[in-house]
Amino acid sequence: LAEEGISRLEIGREKFIDACWDWREDYGNTIVKQIAGMGCSCDYDDEKFTMSPEYANAVRKVFCDWYHDGLIYKGRRIVNWCPSCTTAIADDEAEYVDEKGHLWYLRYPLSEPVDGMEYVVVATTRPETMLGDTGVAVSPKDERYKHLVGKTIDLPIVGRKIPIFADYYVDSEFGTGCVKTTPAHDPNDYAMGQRNNLEQINVFDEHAVVVEGYGKFSGMTRDEAREAIVAEFEALGLLDHVEDHDHSVMTCYRCHTKLEPWLSEQWFV
């Protein structure tokens, strides 16, 4: 379908399932021959396909049984989201790619000066997510920031007040020891948000485009928003400095698009 430029969402569920069966007819025997060629000892007379009726029915039955037993629930949690395939990707399906990136050090102004301090500096590899920041975390053991816990920050560009809070997840040795917290777009931030009752704000839609409500940034892709937000911080005199930073990013095993940690409604076991 991808080679033909056809989206599964455009053709609908029934035609998509038909296409899956067509693919199976075209390639199923080749896959079985490859497995046999590797010397795998299988009962080839009792072959099952993921979408075989008896197999699919068994999965549905187990799902319903677990649901009625209270073992399955629907909730909004962080998932690995592919904005190209528009689907959640399991951890073991994600591929990691090393990337030469940057650490942007951004100045976040305090709502009111504290002991002569007018702002804190946060380090981030993803400045585009700051639109959804709902807090700044510091280590409870970090003497530099203990006096700031409970104070608030006026979030640049967006303008909302967000709290400074203490959480043991924070590594005071990384960056500045102040961590911008975006619960809807980072699994660790999500966990901190749960512990500290932070608001969850999705700033991207299912295609990783900035949603409405963010002025000129709305409608931008992740990369476009990153560039524009960094430029805005620089124009405001709030870009402290930038460092080179190599890190790994998760990509989709199907299309190799960078995955987006995204707050989504899914079924969980």
What residue spans do the PLM features occupy?
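N-terminal Rossmann-like or analogous alpha/beta NTP/dinucleotide-binding catalytic cores
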Residues: 1-68, 192, 221-239
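Gly-rich Lys/Arg/Thr-decorated short loops/hinges at beta-loop-alpha junctions or inter-strand turns
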Residues: 8-15, 171-175, 209
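A short-motif feature that recognizes glycine-rich, charge-decorated loops
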Residues: 210-224
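NTP-handling and nucleic-acid-processing catalytic cores
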Residues: 37, 41-42, 48, 52-207, ...
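Active-site cavity-forming subdomains of large catalytic enzyme subunits
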Residues: 27, 208, 229, 251-253
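Structured, non-catalytic alpha/beta "coupling" segments that mediate domain-domain communication
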Residues: 127-136, 142, 240-269
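A residue-level signal for conserved active-site and pocket-lining positions in enzyme catalytic cores
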Residues: 31, 153, 256
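Short secondary-structure boundary/capping segments
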Residues: 1-3, 89-91, 139-140, 217-220
